[in-house]
C-alpha cells in the first residue's frame, strides 16, 4: 500500500497505536522489548487495522526517566537495537501502509548529553546558554518552583555557583528556548528523522518550553503558571512548524501539561500553523479527589461527561484532539473505570466505543485492544516505577499509611499497571521474552492474550478492529458536531454526533447493573440502524427512544437523513 507523503488530513480518520518498546516484545532473552520485537508484530498491527505507530523514545539515554532523558538525539539506545534495526522497522511498516510517529523530547535533555556536559562548570562554554542558569537568591535556589517529580526544580552547579532549571528529574535539564541556537538544533534533530522517512512526531510536554523570563517565585502554587503555555510558546511552535513540519508534511501531536482549551484551540488550529493535534489529560483526573492522585477513590462520572463535552464542543471547527484512555503513565482503563473481573470484555468494549465515536484521532495503547488489566501486585518489590517506590516511602514511612493500604492504592494508580509486558500467548511470560522479564507479567495472561483474542471473533480485539473501520466508513464520526444528550444521568453516557446527512448515537452504560434511559424525541429511532454493540442481541432494542441497557452495554446507532 503506497503512502503519499503530503496526504495532509490522513490522520483525521486514522487510529494510532502506541508502543512502549520496553514492554512490547523481546526478540531474544534479555527481558526487555526491542525494535526487532516490534518488527515481528507488524502483521498483528496490520490485522488490527491501525494507521500509524507512535513509539515512545528509543534514543540513546541513561533511562533515568524511561528514555524521556535523551543523551543523543541521533542514536538508537542499544537496549532497543541499532539504527539499522530502526531503518528496517520504518521500511517494513511503510510497506504495510503503517506510518511511524516518533516521540521527541525538546523541553529538556539528559544531563549526560554532550551539550550539558560541556556547559557544566564552564560559564564560557558555547553550550552554557543552551540551558537555564540562575544565580542563587539569598544563598539558596533562584525561586520556589517545584519539580514535577517532587522537590525543588533547581540544582546547583558547584563549580560555577549557579543553579540550572529542571522541571522534571535533576538529570533532565531544561533547554533555553530563548536562545535561537537551541531552536536551530531542534530543527536539525527533527529534520534528521523526517529525512529518514519518519511520518510524524509526538512532542513531549511541549507547552512548557517558554518560561516567563523574570522567573518569579510562586506564592500560591508550584510555579507552573509561569511556564505552562508560556509567553512565547505559540511563536516557537510556529517557527518549528514552518521550518520543518510543514516542509515534510509531518503529523504532529503535542502533549499538553495542565493546559487550557483556549490554548489548545490555537496549538491545533485548523490553519495548521502549529500542530496537527493535542493530548490533554483532564478526563484522566476524575478519580483524583481534590486533585490528589494517591488515594483509592471512585471516579466522578458526571465530571467525566462534563470534561468530554467541554473539549468536544470547544475543539469542534477550531482544533483537533487526541482521543485516549491509556498510555504508559496511566493505569489500565478496564481496571480503572470498568469491571476487570465479571464484565471485563463488556466493559472494555463499552469504554472503547465511548471515546472512539467522538471527534478526534483515537490512540490505542498496547494491550488495550485485548482488554489487558492492572496486574494487582501485592508486594512493593514487584514495582519498578520510581514514582511508585518514592510514593511508597513517603506515604508509609513518613505519613504513616499502612503497607496494605498503600499496596491497594498502588494497585490502582501506579504507572507500572500499564507497563507490564504485552501478553502475546499463554506460554511462559506470556510469550514476551525467552528470558526473565524486566517487570513481572500479569498473572491472567493464560486467559488474556493476543493469540486467544485473534482466535475469538467476539473478542475485544475484533471490537476495536470494527471501531477503527467505522471511523473510515462513517463521515459523521470525523466531522459531526457533538452533543451530550443526558448530562445529568447518573449511569448512562449518551451523546449524538450530527452533520447534514447523518446522526450517530453512542449510548453507554458505565455500571454493572441494568439501567434505562429515554432519548430525546427529535431522534427518530425507528429509522436507526445498529452499527455496533457489545451484546449479541441488541438489534431488537434499537427502535425505541426508551432504551434499557444491560451491564456495561454500548450501542452505536446511525440515522441517515
Task: Annotate each predicted stretch with a short phrase.
Residues 99, 103, 200, 251, ...:
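Hydrophobic "anchor" residues on beta-strands that sit immediately upstream
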Residues 219-220, 286-288, 329-332, 440-448:
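Short acidic (Asp/Glu) and glycine-rich catalytic loops that position anionic groups and cofactors
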Residues 1-60, 87, 91-93, 361-364, ...:
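Carbohydrate-interacting/catalytic domains
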Residues 2-191, 195, 208-262, 270, ...:
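Acidic/aromatic-lined carbohydrate-recognition and catalytic surfaces
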Amino acid at each position: 500500500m503506497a503512502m503519499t507523503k503530503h496526504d495532509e488530513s490522513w490522520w483525521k480518520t486514522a487510529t494510532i497505536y502506541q508502543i512502549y518498546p520496553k514492554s512490547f516484545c523481546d526478540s531474544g532473552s534479555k527481558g526487555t522489548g526491542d525494535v526487532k520485537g516490534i518488527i515481528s508484530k507488524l502483521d498483528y498491527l496490520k490485522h488490527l487495522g491501525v494507521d500509524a505507530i507512535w513509539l515512545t523514545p528509543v534514543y540513546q539515554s541513561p533511562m533515568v526517566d524511561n528514555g524521556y532523558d535523551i543523551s543523543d538525539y541521533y542514536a538508537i539506545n542499544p537496549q532497543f537495537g541499532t539504527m539499522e534495526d530502526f531503518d528496517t522497522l520504518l521500511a517494513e511498516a511503510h510497506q504495510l501502509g503503517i506510518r511511524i510517529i516518533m516521540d521527541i523530547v525538546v523541553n529538556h535533555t539528559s544531563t549526560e548529553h554532550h551539550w550539558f556536559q560541556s556547559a557544566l562548570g564552564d560559564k564560557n562554554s558555547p553550550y552554557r546558554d543552551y540551558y537555564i542558569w540562575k544565580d542563587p537568591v539569598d544563598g539558596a535556589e533562584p525561586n520556589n518552583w517545584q519539580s514535577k517529580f517532587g522537590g525543588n526544580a533547581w540544582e546547583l552547579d558547584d563549580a560555577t555557583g549557579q543553579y540550572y532549571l529542571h522541571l522534571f528529574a535533576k538529570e533532565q535539564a531544561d533547554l533555553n528556548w530563548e536562545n535561537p541556537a537551541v531552536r536551530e538544533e531542534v530543527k536539525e534533530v527533527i529534520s534528521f528523522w523526517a529525512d529518514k522517512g519518519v511520518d510524524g512526531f509526538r512532542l513531549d510536554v511541549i507547552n512548557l518550553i517558554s518560561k516567563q523570563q523574570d522567573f518569579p517565585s510562586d506564592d500560591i502554587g508550584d510555579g507552573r503558571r509561569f511556564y505552562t503555555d508560556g509567553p512565547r510558546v505559540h511563536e516557537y511552535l510556529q517557527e518549528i512548524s514552518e521550518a520543518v513540519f510543514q516542509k515534510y508534511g509531518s503529523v504532529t501531536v503535542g502533549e499538553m501539561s495542565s493546559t487550557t482549551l483556549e490554548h489548545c484551540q490555537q496549538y491545533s488550529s485548523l490553519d495548521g500553523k502549529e500542530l496537527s493535534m493535542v493530548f490533554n489529560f483532564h478526563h484522566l483526573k476524575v478519580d483524583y479527589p481534590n486533585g490528589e492522585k494517591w488515594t483509592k477513590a471512585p471516579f466522578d462520572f458526571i465530571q467525566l461527561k462534563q470534561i468530554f463535552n467541554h473539549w468536544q464542543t470547544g475543539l469542534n471547527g477550531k482544533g483537533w484532539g487526541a482521543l485516549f484512555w491509556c498510555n504508559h503513565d496511566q493505569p489500565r482503563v478496564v481496571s480503572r473505570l470498568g469491571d476487570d473481573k465479571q464484565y471485563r470484555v463488556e466493559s472494555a468494549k463499552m469504554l472503547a466505543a465511548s471515546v472512539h465515536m467522538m471527534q478526534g484521532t483515537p490512540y490505542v495503547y498496547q494491550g488495550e485492544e485485548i482488554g489487558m488489566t492492572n496486574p494487582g501486585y501485592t508486594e512493593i518489590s514487584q514495582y519498578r516505577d520510581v514514582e511508585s517506590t518514592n510514593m511508597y516511602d513517603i506515604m508509609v514511612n513518613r505519613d504513616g499509611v499502612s503497607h496494605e493500604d498503600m499496596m491497594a492504592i498502588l494497585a490502582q494508580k501506579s504507572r507500572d499497571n500499564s507497563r507490564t509486558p504485552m501478553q502475546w500467548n499463554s506460554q511462559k511470560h506470556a510469550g514476551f521474552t525467552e528470558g526473565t522479564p524486566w517487570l513481572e507479567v500479569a498473572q491472567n495472561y493464560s486467559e488474556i492474550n493476543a493469540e486467544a483474542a485473534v482466535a475469538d471473533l467476539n473478542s475485544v480485539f475484533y471490537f476495536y478492529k470494527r471501531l477503527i473501520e467505522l471511523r473510515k466508513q462513517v463521515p459523521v464520526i470525523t466531522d459531526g458536531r457533538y452533543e451530550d444528550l443526558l448530562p445529568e444521568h447518573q449511569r448512562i453516557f449518551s451523546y449524538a454526533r450530527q452533520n447534514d446527512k447523518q446522526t450517530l448515537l453512542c449510548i453507554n452504560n458505565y455500571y454493572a447493573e441494568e439501567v434505562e434511559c429515554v432519548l430525546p424525541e427529535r431522534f427518530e429511532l425507528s429509522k436507526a440502524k445498529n452499527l455496533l454493540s457489545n451484546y449479541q442481541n441488541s438489534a431488537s432494542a434499537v427502535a425505541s427512544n426508551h432504551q434499557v441497557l444491560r451491564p456495561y452495554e454500548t450501542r452505536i446507532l446511525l440515522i441517515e437523513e
